[in-house]
Amino acid sequence: MPTEAPPLVVHLVYRFDTGGLENGVVNLINHMPASAYRHAVVALTEVVPAFAARIRRDDVQYLSLHKPPGHGVKLYPRLLQLFRELQPAIVHTRNLAALECQVPAALAGVPVRIHGEHGRDAHDPDGSVRRYQWLRRAYRPFVHRYVALSRELAHYLEHRVGVPPQRIAQIYNGVDLTRFDRGSATRFAPPGCPFSDPALFVVGTVGRMQTVKAQPLLAQAFVRALQMQPALRERLRLVMVGDGPLRADAQAVLDAAGVRDLAWLPGERADVPDVMRGLDCFVLPSLAEGISNTILEAMACALPVLATAVGGNAELVVTAGKGQTGRLVPAGDVAALAAGLIAMSADAAAAVEMGRAGRERVERQFSLRSMVASYQSLYDRLLAERITTRQPA
């Protein structure tokens, strides 16, 4: 007698390409037992094959809808047909750009409809834009459960969008503690990086170079730190890994200051753990964040963190006391970021101790195993409730 196939989860995103949100989908699919759920990834715009190749399961279906800019109401008939063909047990949309897809999912009778809030963009860094609040309220009746990646986002959903707290699950991102590991107390430069001298203090960041990530601000802060303390030219170095529209801007800042040879901007790299192991301090200059995967990855690699005080960063980085893991500075404040770079580089021993505390913190609270178990438990529970009641949650 043939075995019944596991329930299907459709993960619906705007674009399936390099990014923290998308990497979370990859981790979820790769580490959730195949016997529990099948998966499909639907991108409103495009599934990028090179990124999709990170998924190790060969039974995952990928669909690109090539949506033009603007409201996606013209896609509703196609999505309605798609959901009826795929017959998913769960549709899981992520962030505002995909939220409207809850409407055709509801019309298709999808049993469980989940929406994840992973963070904000540069147009609404603090969640105060009323139009975005209104849009979320408009689609609220179509969503059974929300997943907020941080306590700050859960508070936003409850108090700005009006979602009852019992309909919000707060699940932190998790990090692969085996893949992201310091491995050695010694810093090793990744292939191609010119900063192998152990006497150097190497600061760096990893991420797509777009407005919300604000990498040019880090380049400006690096230049400012060297201007404030010229002796740092002998040992302070900058690594900025990633590609995107702001890469040229960041490089231009460094070139204009005459410090091109003190920085390395190699573009996008697949060997992110090796990049992390080539740093002494991880820096995240973002204007907005949910729960940053790269902060968690840096902490797993025993790196101290210098980040902006936005979104869920304060929930990750401990800034005082015995278990201090890093420092937080105001977003957009080049002077404060420069001061943070100087402070980190001035006390290498303290930086190492912060990194050690960070590794211990992610081991306790932010493991990938815990994240996957939380999502699987949510899927199981909601599906059981819907099968039992067949009533709106």
How should these model regions be labeled?
Residues 141-185:
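Donor nucleotide-sugar binding/catalytic pocket of nucleotide-sugar-dependent glycosyltransferases
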Residues 316-334, 343-348:
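Conserved acidic donor-binding segment of nucleotide-sugar-dependent glycosyltransferases
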